[in-house]
UniProtKB/Swiss-Prot annotation:
It comes from the Eukaryota. InterPro entries: SPATA31, SPATA31F3-like. Signal peptide: none annotated. GO terms for biological process: cell differentiation; spermatogenesis. PANTHER family: ACROSOME-SPECIFIC PROTEIN, SPERMATOGENESIS-ASSOCIATED PROTEIN 31D1. It is a single-pass membrane protein. This is Spermatogenesis-associated protein 31D1. May play a role in spermatogenesis.
């Protein structure tokens, strides 16, 4: 070869040289050379094809490597499925190369090719009808021989084979001749003659029988049947024989051909192939019709008239009914002709079970009792039935799976994946060939019913006839029904027996998903059970290849002529009986047993019992059934077997009782767990309960929450059902049921809207069930609320959703009168509740939560009808009786007696919580107040001028009460469930309420209203936190957990434990993004107060209330900071209710950066003011008030409330548009450590209080004044308990920093502060007119304050505050309506960077500031300004104890009389529409203000750089006063206007960038109306 190549190369080089003329000389040599090269190439190809398997394998691997490299850099990257497709192709190549490596050298003869193909075919699986294995064999053939591939492609291709099977009818004949199978051909039938039968030749019979011949144990796989595609043999024209069974019903026969089709060629692969449905579907292979026609032909008398019908493939199901030689015996010299019908157009999905019955005897009687290959094919005949043989039989045989030892684990996994992928692809391709279209049985919604259920339904329908479900491969489930044999024939199955055969198909898990665990093969009275891939329980040593001696059987009387069968040598004939439909026989009656023998053939062990026939145990049945379910689910969803194992172990289907009764009364297994596992009784019980719950979930197919919500729509179950269920099943574990109930309560808590504070007797008595908008507090049954406190616990605050759920369910039931429980049922309510959960688990009905809610509602409904004493007595009796209601008969082994008692007590308290749903402390308070009748009646005639939810704080250390209430201004009813208002009273009210050491922090979450009520027990502090929304559009007004003092001019005090009560109120607006916070606590020596926006005005005293609330000299305590309107407006408001909407506004501190969505603040209505902080984290107000007094609500107040609610609507309409906001900010630098002095105009100092103020505006017709809000009278006991409480910056409200008296005065801080307080004390106790002298307006003198009580409080408080502290003076400055806006924004510029530690500097600053302010404000706007008597200081973040001097501004009427009032650093006050301001908020430093004040027009807007507009209100043209001359330059150097900047973060109240404030030289220009240039 090398010489030839060298010769050719040399001549080629010579001929290709440029100067060579050789091409012209010898052209023939070139042709010869080319021909030689072509021959060499062909020779090389032949050597490559027929080289050794090792070389071929190496070449293929190299080929694959090159292909892989090409794929990596190929051009198909854009194709979505290209990589996966290439991966599958690569795996397929590996599989084929592996199979080729195991094959012997192939000879060139066709016979050798077939044997080699059979060898590889056996390697895959012995199943002759496996489409996937045939495809693999065909691929092997393609690789082995290109020539044979051309002829064999139509026969080995799955698609071609199924196509060739369509619309083809054939007749096979057999003759005694020895014609080889290769000569098999088909011939047409004579047209004039009757339809000839299907005939096979004996040689073909012999050849095909070799497929099922016995084989040694070491060679369990059968040989591959010969493909006779390329070889024909003539038909034997022996007389045809008639089939002994009737034809199919006419409506299932599409047509009966009168003549045969032209001569056709069919291969065995075509015969073995499937139809157009699932290619690897064993269900089609085991179809009764198909199996009868293909595998079994009955012995036919030759004298019968011939009949034939032609069967072709229908497009939706199995195709050609084929006749195989398995129905004949092996060997023999002669043969008899047999015929099988071929029927065309059968729709297997519509064939009734009765129509297949005639196939059954033919399928069974065509076998010999000792012919094992026929048994093997017979088991394929019958459908899967795991429970058709549940009668007193048990399985006696399981097989040993065949192991292919020469295959590694990786190879087996590769084979399995390849088979699955190929099968899935073929299934999809053959079932419609549409993208995403899968057969109905492969869809997820196709329910996989239990085989026993189908068997039961069919058995009931057809009496003794059994129907067998059929399991398909890859999850396909198709039910075909086959009935018992015809009943009118004699049976010679007496010599037969019930056989148990277990099969194994090929590799482990390779084809196990295509087969099914149990198949019942029935033969007369005997049945053979075939089990696939089961667990072996018989040893191999019991196997014996010896066949039993054959038994001669008599001919049936129904057959006119016997049919002699040709059997192998050494065997006697065995004939079978064909039965008719009229005489069904029981398939479970076993007759004469035969000796035990075990035959292993084709990888299948046939194990038959020796003495008795037994069926599978229920546990084994469950195991086999779930084995198939696992494969089905894996093929459907691709879930791993580990995930499916939990379903197999814990969720087996329950046995069907009807099937058990039909199957010789086999008892239902006690344990529902498959297998005999060593489980203890306790674990078994838990598993059973778990399985019950899982079964309920699977039955409903819905999540638990959805199921519970659906169960709410069902009618109420009767009590008798509960009791019956309890008697049947018994009560459950107490702890288990209670835990489940608690879980259900948590899950169902958010199902319906609810509000805990909207309870009323209307809801309980079903008078107003559908009204969920709120209920009046006055209608709440007090006797219901005031039952004994021992019936509830402070831990047991019932979820408000329970009550609403109860009401909703009662509303759905619609029958109030017929559902009440008696006294006896009430006593047994706890026991009934224990059984409700068990009923829910076992019956899947309504949850126990709904039942218990109904019970609670029924019990509570009768409460308002009875007196308080009766209810209390009844509750006590109920509690006593409930001690005997708890069912403890079922002992809980794992709980001690103490824990069981605790559980019982918890159940009792939980029930009472369900009934009452109120905190213990609230009940105690109401009980005490209820007992004080004289105290409650004393408040019955109070007027309601205004409202302010009053929260007091006595000791910030002991407790803080936060109330975030939902406040509405358009409500129709005012619900104050847990609050008792203290109405307007001319004298202080004392209450002997003793709440010593009682404080709860109670938290209740409501998903709808976002109500948060927290109660916790602290040492002696009663705190409550309620979080709600301020909704301006809702229809109810809740002031929960707060005790408002409405329009009170005097403080209502409680002398008992006043120092241990305090509240911190927060009004949080989720709707408007507004937050109203009022923190009344003692922190850093200051005190502030925020009245809530509630307003209640009596219609009778309406005019007087308006006058009193707006024109009093000293405002009511709860209206701190509320000013008086001009005299003209007050006169007009007497006759106009709309004036109640409040022409006076108080705009508190607002966090503008966090109120971008809605910037309008919560404004006070009808003489009340509110403080709003948008984000609940930056604003707090602290103020000391006496502890709250709980006064019972007067029933007459409902009329007053209803009258006020209508007026509140008017207020809302008028103030719906955004109002301008006045902000009171604090420029605390670096930290809030500097204690601020809370100095009141009346001289109240609250010591170490918080850091916030409220700007209060008072409009006077004669001028503008800054009125200090009224401070509460703080008793000595309260003040002595006050301690510094350091709130975080996010909690403390932003407020101007006040100077320390000790630091500014240079002396003793405590003494200086105390003296200053003493100086301001007489001012505090005097009216505004007294403070101002003759310059005060007459309206301020109308109602003088109670000086005695106030002085007493202030003296005691000043004695206690003898330490360094900061006192604030909260003042209010406002311009009269029509006057210019006076933005006295005060702060210190660069001068304040110096530390004022000496008295001299402080005195100088104070003097200069006072002179400047008096001159500036007094001349310009008619306001006398008195500088503070003490220096102010700012702490500067430079590491030094520097201070912030603060200018205190006192705005007086035009007379300009000096006063001692001090204004905070930013007092921007105005009327409702007299100014316009735009506040831009800076981020890290104080904002710079530009303010223009012109003498002839209104003040322009106040601006701040680098911020956002907080509010703008367009001013109206108003007359203005003359401009004020320039102030003293000395004082100007001390003052710089600072905008009430809004903090931008939680730490923004602390501004450390003091140099950014405007400088000294800019003050004169600013105060004269100039603008500031931005400073840096």
């Amino acid at each position: 070869m090398e010489n030839i190549l060298c010769f050719l190369n040399s001549y080629t080089e010579t001929g290709l040289s440029p100067d060579s003329h050789w091409l012209d000389i010898d052209p023939n040599f070139i042709c010869l050379s080319g021909l030689g090269l072509f021959i060499l190439y062909l020779f090389y190809v032949v050597l490559t094809l027929y080289s050794s398997p090792t070389e071929k394998n190496n070449d293929i691997q190299k080929h694959q490597g090159r292909a892989k490299r090409r794929r990596k850099g190929g051009t198909f990257k854009g194709f979505p499925d290209w990589k996966s497709f290439q991966r599958e192709e690569e795996e397929e190549r590996k599989l084929l190369s592996l199979l080729k490596s195991f094959g012997p050298p192939v000879s060139c003869s066709p016979r050798g090719q077939h044997h080699d193909t059979n060898h590889f075919r056996r390697l895959l699986c012995p199943d002759p009808v496996c489409r996937v294995c045939k495809r693999a064999t065909a691929d092997i053939q393609q690789l082995l021989s290109w020539e044979s591939l051309k002829d064999a492609a139509p026969s080995v291709s799955p698609l071609a084979s199924s196509a060739s099977a369509t619309e083809s009818s054939f007749t096979l004949a057999s003759t005694p001749s020895a014609t080889p199978p290769e000569d098999l051909i088909l011939s047409p039938r004579p047209k004039a003659s009757p339809p000839p039968p299907l005939i096979l030749s004996p040689d073909l019979i012999t050849t095909l029988a070799d497929l099922f011949s016995p084989s040694p144990l070491r060679d369990p796989l059968p040989p591959q049947p010969v493909s006779p595609l390329d070889s024909k043999f003539p038909i034997d024209h022996s007389p045809p024989q008639q089939l002994p069974f009737p034809l199919l019903p006419p409506h299932h026969i599409e047509r009966v051909e009168s003549s045969l089709q032209p001569e056709a060629s069919l291969s065995l692969n075509t015969i073995f192939s499937f139809g157009s449905t699932l290619c690897q579907d064993i269900s089609q292979a085991m179809n009764p019709i198909d199996s009868c026609a293909r595998h079994h032909g009955p012995p036919i008398p030759s004298a019968l008239p011939p009949e034939d019908c032609t069967v072709t493939q229908s497009k939706s199901s199995l195709t050609i009914l084929k006749t195989f030689p398995e129905m004949l015996s092996l060997g023999g010299s002669g043969g008899s002709s047999t015929s099988a019908p071929t029927i065309k157009g059968i729709d297997h999905s519509h064939l009734a079970s009765s129509e297949f019955t005639w196939w059954q005897p033919h399928a069974k009687d065509s076998f010999s009792s000792n012919f094992v290959p026929s048994d093997f094919m017979e088991e394929l005949l019958t459908l899967h039935s795991s429970e058709a043989f549940l009668g007193g039989h048990s399985v006696a045989n399981l097989i040993e799976p065949v192991n292919i030892s020469f295959l590694s684990h990786d190879i087996l996994a590769l084979l399995e994946r390849q088979v699955k992928k190929r099968g899935d692809f073929l299934m999809w391709k053959e079932n419609g060939k549409k993208p995403g279209s899968f057969p109905k049985q492969l869809r997820p919604n196709y329910q996989l019913n239990s085989s026993r259920n189908m068997l039961t339904s069919i058995a009931v329908k057809h009496d003794l006839a059994e129907s067998f479900p059929f399991w398909a491969s890859k999850g396909k489930l198709e039910w075909q029904h086959i009935h018992q044999q015809p009943p009118h024939s004699k049976c010679f199955e007496d010599h037969l027996e019930q056989k148990y055969v277990q099969l194994f198909w090929g590799l482990p898990s390779l084809h196990s998903e295509s087969l099914h665990p149990t198949v019942l093969v029935q033969r007369g009275h005997s049945s053979m059970f075939v089990f696939f891939n089961g667990i072996t329980n018989t040893s191999i040593s019991h196997e014996s290849p010896v066949l039993p001696p054959p038994q001669p059987l008599s001919l049936p009387s129904t057959q006119p002529l016997p049919l002699p069968q040709t059997l192998p040598q050494g065997q006697s004939p065995h004939l079978t009986q064909v039965k008719s439909l009229a005489q069904p026989q029981s398939p479970f009656r076993a007759l004469l047993p035969s000796p035990l023998f075990l035959i292993r053939i084709c990888g299948v062990c046939f194990h038959r019992p020796q003495n008795e026939a037994r069926s599978l145990l229920p546990s084994e049945i469950n195991h086999l059934e779930w084995n198939v379910l696992q494969k089905v689910q894996e093929s459907l969803w691709g879930l791993p077997s580990v995930v499916q194992k939990s379903q197999e172990d814990f969720c087996p289907p329950a046995p069907n009782p009807e099937l058990v009764r039909k199957s010789f009364k086999v008892h239902v297994p006690i344990s529902i767990i498959p297998g005999d596992f060593p489980l203890s009784s306790e674990v078994r019980k838990k598993l059973e309960q778990h399985i019950r719950r899982r079964l309920i979930q699977r039955r409903w197919g819905l999540p638990r929450r959805i199921h519970e919500s659906l169960s709410l729509l069902r009618p109420q179950s009767k009590i008798s059902e509960l009791s019956v269920s309890e008697r049947i099943h018994g009560p459950l574990n107490i702890s288990l049921v209670e835990g489940q109930r608690c879980n259900v309560l948590k899950k169902s808590a958010s199902s319906f809207p609810r509000s805990f504070h909207e309870r009323s007797s209307n809801m309980l008595s079903m008078e107003n069930v559908g009204n969920y908008q709120g209920y009046s507090q006055e209608t709440v049954p007090k006797d219901h609320l005031l039952h004994g406190p021992e019936t509830s616990s402070d831990k047991d605050l019932r979820s408000n959703s329970e009550r609403d759920l109860e009401t909703h369910m009662m509303h759905l039931s619609g029958n109030d009168s017929g559902v009440r429980l008696g006294q006896k049922q009430l006593e047994n309510a706890l026991t009934v509740r224990l059984s409700k959960k068990f009923e829910e688990i076992n019956e899947g009905r309504m949850p126990g939560t709904v039942h218990s809610s109904w019970h609670s509602v029924k019990q509570t409904m009768s409460l308002p009808e009875k007196s308080h004493s009766q209810i209390k007595h009844r509750n006590l009796v109920t509690l006593v009786s409930e001690d005997h209601c708890v069912d403890t008969s079922q002992e809980i082994s794992f709980l001690s007696s103490n824990k069981q008692k605790m559980l019982e007590a918890h159940i009792k308290t939980f029930r009472m919580r369900m009934l009452w749903g109120l905190p213990l402390k609230v009940l105690e308070s109401i009980e005490i107040f209820k007992s004080k009748a004289d105290l409650s009646t004393s408040f019955s005639h109070f007027d309601l001028p205004s409202s302010a939810t009053f929260i007091s704080q006595g000791d910030s250390k002991d407790g803080v009460s936060k109330s975030r209430s939902r406040s509405t201004f358009q409500g129709e009813k005012l619900g104050t469930t847990s609050s008792v208002p203290i109405l307007d009273r001319p004298h202080p009210v004392s209450s002997p309420v003793v709440q010593e050491g009682q404080g709860t922090l109670r938290r209740q979450f409501s998903d709808t209203d976002h109500d948060l009520i927290e109660t916790d027990s602290k040492d002696g502090a009663s705190t409550s936190l309620r979080r709600g929304t301020t909704d301006f559009q809702s229809e109810k007004l809740d002031s929960t957990s707060s005790f408002p003092i409405l329009g009170h001019s005097y403080l209502v005090t409680s002398p008992v434990n006043q120092e241990k009560q305090g509240t911190l109120r927060r009004e949080f607006s989720d709707t408007d993004n507004d937050l109203t916070e009022s923190v009344r606590t003692t922190e850093d020596g200051r005190q502030t107060f925020l009245p809530p926006p509630h307003s209640i005005v009596d219609e009778v005293s309406q005019k007087q209330t308006v006058l009193a609330s707006r024109c009093s000299a000293e405002l009511p305590i709860m209206q701190a900071g509320a000013g008086c309107e001009s005299w003209d407006k007050r006169k007009s408001s007497f006759h106009n209710v709309d004036r109640l909407q409040g022409s006076r506004k108080t705009f508190p501190v607002t966090n503008a950066l966090q109120s971008q969505t809605r910037n309008n603040l919560t404004t006070s209505k009808s003489g009340s003011c509110s403080l709003t902080n948008v984000k609940a984290s930056t604003s707090n107000e602290t103020e000391i008030f006496p502890p709250r007094i709980s006064v019972p609500q007067d029933p007459k107040s409902s009329y007053l409330k209803n009258q006020m609610l209508s007026q509140l609507k008017l207020v809302q309409r008028k103030h719906s548009q955004p109002q301008s906001h006045f902000t009171d900010m604090s420029f605390a630098l670096d930290n809030l450590s500097s204690k601020d002095l809370l100095t009141n105009s009346q001289g109240i100092s609250s010591g170490d209080m918080g850091t916030s103020q409220v700007v209060h505006v008072h409009l006077e017709d004669s001028g503008i004044r800054v009125a200090q809000k009224q401070e509460p009278r703080v008793p000595t006991c309260v003040l002595q308990k006050c301690q510094v409480t350091n709130f975080p910056p996010a909690v403390n409200r932003v407020s101007p920093v006040r100077p320390k008296g000790g630091e500014l005065d240079g002396g003793d801080a405590g003494l200086g502060t105390s003296q200053r307080r003493r100086k301001s004390l007489p001012v505090h106790n005097k009216t505004s007119g007294e403070v101002l002298g003759s310059k005060s307006s007459p309206t301020l003198k109308t109602q003088p304050p109670p000086e005695n009580l106030f002085r007493k409080w202030m003296k005691t408080s000043l004695q206690w505050f003898n330490k360094p502290s900061i006192s604030y003076e909260e003042q209010e400055s406002s311009w009269e309506k029509g006057s210019s806006l006076s933005s006295c924004v005060q702060n210190i510029g660069r001068v304040i960077r110096a530390a004022f530690t000496g008295t001299t500097e402080a005195q100088k600053i104070r003097k200069d500031t006072r002179e400047f302010l008096e001159e500036k404000l007094g001349h310009r706007h008619g306001i006398d300004i008195t500088c503070p008597q003490e220096p102010l200081s700012f702490p500067v973040g430079l590491g030094k104890a520097q201070h912030n001097p603060e200018v205190h501004v006192r705005a007086e009427p035009v007379q300009g009389c000096p006063c001692n009032y001090r204004a905070p650093s930013c007092k921007v006050t105005r009327t409702k529409s007299c100014s316009q301001q735009a506040i831009f908020v800076g981020q890290n430093y104080p904002t710079r203000i530009r303010q223009i004040i012109d003498k002839d027009r209104q003040p322009q807007k106040v601006e701040a750089f680098k911020g956002k507009i907080l509010c703008q209100s367009h001013p109206q043209s108003m007359p203005h006063r003359k401009p004020v001359p320039h102030p003293n330059p000395t004082c100007r150097r001390q003052v710089s206007l600072v905008c009430p900047a809004v903090p931008t973060s939680a730490k923004s109240p602390v501004f450390s960038d003091v140099p950014f404030l405007t400088g000294q030289k800019m003050l004169p220009k600013h105060l004269q109306g100039g603008k500031f240039p931005p400073t840096k």
